[in-house]
C-alpha cells in the first residue's frame, strides 16, 4: 500500500467530491422518508381506532408524498453504495469484511421488508383488512428505520472502529465481534440522534404543507389536524434530538477530539473551556494554528464546552495545538502527531517486511516477532500515510459554521413547534395568521439546511480519515484517472438535479391537485 503515497491529489479531491455530492443528495430524501413514516402511521392509527373516513383520506394523502420521496431515496442510495467499490476499492479491500456485514444485513432484512410492505400499503386499501393494512404501514416505516440502523452502524464504525483485528497475511481487517460492531456505543448514539432528527424534518414538512393549504383556505380540517399531530411529534423529536446530540458530543470528545476542536475553532484547550456561541472565523482560509490564540469577536458561554464534552464544568478539552503536540488527559498521555506518524510508518515497514519474509518461507519465530511489533503499532497505521501534521486538521471554517447552523436552526425549530403547537391545539386555528403560515414555509428549507449541516460536521470533521486513525482517504481511493471521476461527478450532478426537480414537481402537483371532497 506504500505506492498510495504518490497518488494523484486531484483524484482524491474528485473522489471525495463525488461521494459528498451523492451523500448530500441522498440525505435530502432519507429524513423525509423516516419522518413521514412515523406521522402517516399515527394518522392511519387514528383511522383504525375511530373508523372515520377523514383519517383514511388524510393518511392516503401523506402516503402519496411518502411514496415519491421513498423512490428517490432508494435510487440515490443504491448509487452511493456502489461508489465504495468503484471509487474506494482500497477501502473496500482493507475493511470490506467488516463494513460489508451491516450493509448486507440492511439489504437482506430491512430493504426486503420495506419493499414488501410498501406495496401492501399502497395497493392494499380495500384489499386487506384495516388491521393488516395498518400493520403494513407501520412495518414500512420500521423497515426504513432498521435500514437506517445498519447503515449508521457502518458509518459509526468508520468513525470509531471496534470489533476487528488486522490480519497481516491478507492485509485486511477482519471482524472479531459482530456484537461489538452492531452495538457500538458510538453507533447507538448516532442512530438515535439521526433518526430523531428525521422526525423533526418530517414534522416541519407536514406543518409547512398544511400551512400552505391554510394560506389558501383549502383543506382546512385536514391541515389543522395534520399540524396538531406534527407539532407534538416535532416537540418530542426536537427534545430527543438535543438530548441524543449531547450524548454524541461526549462520544466525539472521547474518540475524535480533533473533530470537536474543529467544530469550536479551539486552538489551545484546557480545563473549564468556554463554548463559543459565535465568532468571526474567516470562512475562506484555514487558521494558522501554530500561533494559537482564538477567533476574533468571540462570544462564548463560560465553561460551556467542558460541560458539553465531559459533563463537568472543569473538564479538560484539548485544542488543535494540544492534539498535534501531544497532551495528557485523565492520567493518560496522548502521542504527538509526529510520534503517531513515526509509529504509522514503522507499521507500514513492518508489514512489508512480514509479507516479504512470509513469501520467502521465513521461520515462525521471526514472523511472530514481526507480527507482535505490527500489532503494537497498528493503532497508528493510518498515520503512516500522513506527510504533514497540518493534514490532520479538518477544515475549520466549514465545521465551525455548519455546527452552529445545525444547533441554531434546531433551537429555532423548538420554538416554532411550541408556538404552532400551542395555536394548533386551541379549538380552532385562525385562518388570519398569515405570518405564522409563511414562517412555517420558511422553516422547511432551513430544516433541510440544518440536517445537511449535521452530516457535514460528522463527515468533514473526521478528515483526513476514511476510517478514524486506521485509513486516511489518500489510502482508501481507487487507482483511477481523475478525469473519469470528474466526468462521472458532473453526470451524477445532472442526474441527481433532474431527480430532485422531478420529485419537487411531482410533490407540488400532488399537493396542488389534492381535494378531499372528490
Where are these regions (language model features)?
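Polytopic transmembrane helical bundles with strong interfacial aromatic enrichment
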Residues: 1-518
